[in-house]
């Protein structure tokens, strides 16, 4: 068994303050990724020392450089001072780890790989630096590393592109060794006039103008300007996600992604907008949000005129018009124009829903679905339309609503020329012409055009009714049903019938009611020719011909063709009668029964005969009365062929034949 003395110093990457200032934002993010991953690998080898300050700062997303000291003495926590270097020799920070030679070599390869990413970038930088001292430092450093690797044959080496300092030398001498960097010298780009602190940053910037991309991915052919970008990109092909959230188990390709994700669980939003006091998880989100106040939108689509704040979103949008979908699901072959859409789609196959609502226990595949769902409990509607003041739970709902005011509909159907504001709406609409129903119920085989309709349908089988009325406790399968139901408690009825003065909570109720006066029955049964005022009545009627009775009572086994009949029947077993008359105290199991009963007290008779002017409380009474004028007798006795206007009369007659 081989024994190796491994310290955090062996896998740390050190920079002076001036060297740190030369790194751009992307390089600093890479430094954070490499340092954290190396430390995690060291812990997996058995390192049990106290967590270094630099790791704590990096995990918190803070700047790792200490600013309390003067310019020549400042250093990053990765740069060890004489005091800290001596401290490493104590038993507290050096641990003897018993590992097999093979396992050490395997981990060593991983650490070298992570360090090499950063080493290549830093060595590239030294090629552009004009300071001779920095070049000499780079050469001497390579010699030291080479010497260390050749002499430490017995002990496996974990050396990356480390800066190995003599503990007897001061930090000032260390800075001299690394070369002097004159921060006063500015370098201007001749193309656009941008100014940079050093030649390296200028050279990287100029690649934007030249379009130079020297690093190519062998898997997909995508090219990158920097080697570290290629290395990070390759993780998408390998599927490597080394950073795992301990709260929900979700894994990430980069540490900053994990850091941003963890803020979802903590609820911490450290980046505040000074204009509206809105909080955000990341600085990027805040930057994007600020453009709402400034109105800056620089990228315009030539096809439809839509403008975007970021070029990233603009390029994604362009794929809608070109039809390009480069991201394909390996499970089902479905392709997507945006990588994020593929990532979300893949969770359908895994079935993983790690985000759970603490209020109702409902789980979601994506965190923002949970965030949107929570607003239903809190009653929050943070997205307000500036045109009409209407508020929404979800930003997407607001964006859809805005098209009402703008009237822009750039996506037209090629079959019927109907136009839509969103490509997704057009895609769904096209299924009407193609007959495509991609969402199938595994229980009964019924297929649907929309996933949301399938989800609602599946609740018929599961019996789940997640939407509960806080006023009366009644539950519903569909959100739209509870929205309609809530208006029962408000008593607001803004829709009034001009003929009889009756008021309704909803416009479509008024439309259906007006057919009573006009006699219009647009929904006709193809089997028997019977017509109906409402589509729902026709659908229920069709079940008579099919003999289908899908609603079974678990208490007594009785089956029903209509859901309404089934719901009414269940109240026999429960005895629940939530609708009470304020006049006489009589209670009813259905609101419609209460409404009909109240006409006894009010004297209301909305159904009037056009022949003689007689009025009735119920539409069925009017129908029976009209048969006096028409002479219609639809109920015939099968024994003697005598016919009757009302079913009750036939029932009484059949007793004479001893049929009943």
Curated annotation (Swiss-Prot):
Zinc finger (C2H2-type): 187-209, 215-237, 243-265, 271-293, 299-321, 327-349, 355-377, 383-405, 411-433, 439-461, 467-489, 495-517, 523-545, 551-573, 579-601, 607-629, 635-657
Segment forming the signal sequence: none
GO CC annotations, alphabetized: cytoplasm; cytosol; intracellular membrane-bounded organelle; nucleoplasm; nucleus
Annotated KRAB domain residues: 6-77
This protein's UniProt keywords: Cytoplasm, DNA-binding, Isopeptide bond, Metal-binding, Nucleus, Repeat, Repressor, Transcription, Transcription regulation, Ubl conjugation, Zinc, Zinc-finger
Main location: nucleus
Pfam families reported for this sequence: KRAB, zf-C2H2, zf-C2H2_6
Cross-link entry Glycyl lysine isopeptide (Lys-Gly) (interchain with G-Cter in SUMO2), positions: 109
GO biological process: negative regulation of DNA-templated transcription; negative regulation of translation; regulation of transcription by RNA polymerase II
SUPFAM superfamilies the record matches: beta-beta-alpha zinc fingers, KRAB domain (Kruppel-associated box)
Molecular functions (GO terms): DNA-binding transcription factor activity, RNA polymerase II-specific; mRNA regulatory element binding translation repressor activity; RNA polymerase II cis-regulatory region sequence-specific DNA binding; zinc ion binding
UniProt cross-references to Gene3D superfamilies, sorted A to Z: 6.10.140.140, Classic Zinc Finger
Tissue-by-tissue expression: Expressed in several fetal tissues, including gut, heart, brain, muscle, lung, testis and liver.
Location within or outside the cell: Nucleus; Cytoplasm
Superkingdom, natural source: Eukaryota
Family recorded in the similarity comment: Belongs to the krueppel C2H2-type zinc-finger protein family.
Self-association and partners: May interact with MVP.
Function of the protein: May act as a transcriptional repressor.
Protein name (Swiss-Prot/TrEMBL): Zinc finger protein 540
């Amino acid at each position: 068994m081989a024994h190796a003395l491994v310290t955090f110093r062996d896998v740390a990457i050190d920079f002076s303050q001036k060297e740190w200032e030369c790194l751009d934002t992307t390089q600093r993010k890479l430094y954070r990724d490499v340092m954290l991953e190396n430390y995690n690998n060291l812990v997996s080898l058995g390192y049990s020392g106290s967590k270094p300050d630099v790791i704590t700062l990096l995990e918190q997303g803070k700047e790792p450089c200490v600013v309390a000291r003067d310019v020549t003495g400042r250093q990053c926590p990765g740069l060890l001072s004489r005091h800290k270097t001596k401290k490493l020799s104590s038993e507290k920070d050096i641990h003897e780890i018993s590992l097999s030679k093979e396992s050490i070599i395997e981990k060593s390869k991983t650490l070298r790989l992570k360090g090499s990413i950063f080493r290549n970038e830093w060595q590239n930088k030294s090629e552009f630096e004009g300071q001779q001292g920095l070049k000499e430092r780079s050469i001497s450093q390579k010699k030291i590393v080479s010497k260390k690797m050749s002499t430490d044959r017995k002990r496996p080496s974990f050396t990356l592109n480390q800066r190995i300092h003599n503990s007897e030398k001061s930090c000032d001498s260390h800075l001299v060794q690394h070369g002097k960097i004159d921060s006063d010298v500015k370098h201007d780009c001749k193309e656009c006039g941008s100014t940079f602190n050093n030649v390296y940053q200028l050279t990287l910037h100029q690649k934007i103008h030249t379009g130079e991309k020297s690093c190519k991915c062998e898997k997909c052919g995508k090219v990158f300007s920097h080697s570290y970008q290629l290395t990070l990109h390759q993780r998408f092909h390998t599927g490597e996600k080394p950073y795992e959230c301990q709260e929900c188990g979700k894994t990430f390709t980069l540490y900053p992604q994990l850091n941003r994700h963890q803020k979802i669980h903590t609820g911490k939003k450290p980046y505040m907008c000074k204009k509206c006091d809105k909080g955000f998880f990341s600085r990027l989100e805040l930057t994007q949000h600020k453009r709402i106040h400034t109105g800056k939108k620089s990228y315009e689509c030539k096809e439809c005129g839509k403008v975007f704040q970021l070029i990233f979103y603009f390029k994604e949008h362009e794929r809608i018009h070109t039809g390009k979908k480069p991201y394909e699901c390996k499970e089902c072959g479905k392709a997507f124009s945006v990588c994020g859409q593929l990532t979300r789609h893949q969770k359908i196959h895994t079935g993983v829903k790690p985000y759970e609502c603490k209020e109702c226990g409902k789980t979601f595949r994506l965190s923002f679905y949970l965030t949107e769902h929570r607003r239903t409990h809190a009653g929050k509607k943070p997205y307000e339309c500036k045109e009409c003041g209407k508020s929404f739970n979800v930003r997407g709902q607001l964006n859809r609503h805005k098209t009402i005011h703008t009237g822009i509909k750039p996506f037209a159907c090629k079959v019927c020329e109907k136009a839509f504001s969103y490509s997704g709406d057009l895609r769904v609409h096209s299924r009407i012409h193609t007959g495509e129903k991609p969402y199938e119920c595994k229980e009964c085989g019924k297929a649907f055009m929309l996933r949301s309709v399938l989800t609602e349908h599946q609740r018929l089988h599961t019996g789940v009714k997640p939407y509960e009325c806080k006023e009366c406790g009644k539950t519903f399968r569909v959100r739209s049903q509870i929205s309609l139901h809530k208006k029962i408690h408000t008593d607001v009825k803004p829709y009034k019938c001009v003929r009889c003065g009756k008021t309704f909570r909803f416009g479509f109720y008024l439309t259906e009611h007006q057919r009573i006066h006009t006699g219009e029955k647009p929904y006709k049964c193809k089997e028997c020719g019977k017509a109906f005022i409402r589509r729902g009545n026709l659908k229920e009627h069709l079940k008579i011909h099919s003999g289908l009775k899908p609603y079974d009572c678990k208490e007594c086994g009785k089956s029903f063709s209509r859901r309404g009949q089934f719901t009414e029947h269940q109240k026999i077993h429960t005895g629940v009668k939530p609708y009470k008359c304020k006049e006489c105290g009589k209670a009813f199991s259905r609101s419609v029964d209460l409404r009909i009963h109240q006409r006894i007290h009010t004297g209301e008779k909305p159904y009037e005969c056009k022949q003689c002017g007689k009025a009735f409380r119920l539409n069925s009474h009017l129908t029976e009365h009209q048969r006096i004028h028409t002479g219609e007798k639809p109920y015939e006795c099968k024994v003697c062929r005598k016919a009757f206007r009302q079913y009750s009369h036939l029932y009484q007659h059949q007793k004479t034949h001893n049929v009943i």
